[in-house]
Amino acid sequence: MTKALAAIVGSGNIGTDLLYKLLRSEIIEPRWMIGVDPDSEGLKRAADRGVIASAEGVDWLLAQDERPDIVFEATSAYVHRANAPRYRELGIQAVDLTPAALGPAVVPAVNMGEHRTAPNVNLITCGGQATIPMVYAVSRITEVAYAEIVASVASPSAGPGTRANIDEFTITTSRGIETIGGAKKGKAIIILNPAEPPMFMKDTVFCSIPADADRDAITASIHDVAASVQAYVPGYRLRAEPQFDDPTPISGGLARVGIFLEVEGAGDFLPPYSGNLDIMTAAATKVGESFATQILGASV
């Protein structure tokens, strides 16, 4: 079967976990893994699995006679900002797993269909990938005046990049809650949980809704969208049924629905408690396969 050719740029934890997922894809062939450290564990694992592994960076990749159809960038925002124009000039679609946010933000279960031909798409944040689908599930049934999410992740799964970009996490996720999730106002909070043993990623979503909103329809929509996410993130699940609260004197006449989530990682390269990272690589794979379907269809 013909497959779209892909390169993973970045041979760290995210890039290596993504490699395992792409190796299982029926329509993407991860042909190259690119890094800058010749002693990288990711490059070694890629080479062991027959993937062309180079520590000579993007310059080397783009100088090859054969080039990828899709690049998955798992480096840093700074590096991606430098590389993105080069990918675009060569007609290579980019899936950005960094905070660079140069292209439209995508959550596969919500708005992938709008961006299949985009030259560059951004995956927001792990908290966004987990919670925006739930805000969307509510907002497609009734107006959401305000949505607040709390993403709690195991401290060992949060590397220096995450810790240095907490403000960016909250700003970017809040924006996605509004622009993709459909809430009029969004707020995001991240908690790094130091518990031992490390816990799975847990997310709480609160949406303010009209007092007369159809609660049965909202519940059905939440389950429907959760199933859509589970199709590409098997460890994504509701921890309980949605909980509804009636209006209170301080709620402005609005009711509230609470949604409680858990994300268990697949354990491909990262440990299962790293659901916050796994959901990013799973979403990247789903987006890449959408790109590949478009690319392969156009080449027939």
Curated annotation (Swiss-Prot):
**Enzyme class, spelled out:** oxidoreductase
Q: What is this protein called?
A: Acetaldehyde dehydrogenase 4
Name the residues annotated as catalytic in the UniProt entry. Answer: C126 (acyl-thioester intermediate)
**What is stated as this protein's family in its record?**
Belongs to the acetaldehyde dehydrogenase family.
Any Pfam family = AcetDehyd-dimer
Q: What is its EC number?
A: 1.2.1.10
The protein's matches in InterPro entries, at most eight in alphabetical order, are given as: Acetaldehyde_dehydrogenase, Acetylaldehyde_DH_C, NAD(P)-bd_dom_sf, Semialdehyde_DH_NAD-bd
| Keywords, comma-separated and alphabetical | Aromatic hydrocarbons catabolism, NAD, Oxidoreductase
Record bears the keyword Oxidoreductase: yes
Q: Which residue positions does the secretion signal occupy?
A: none
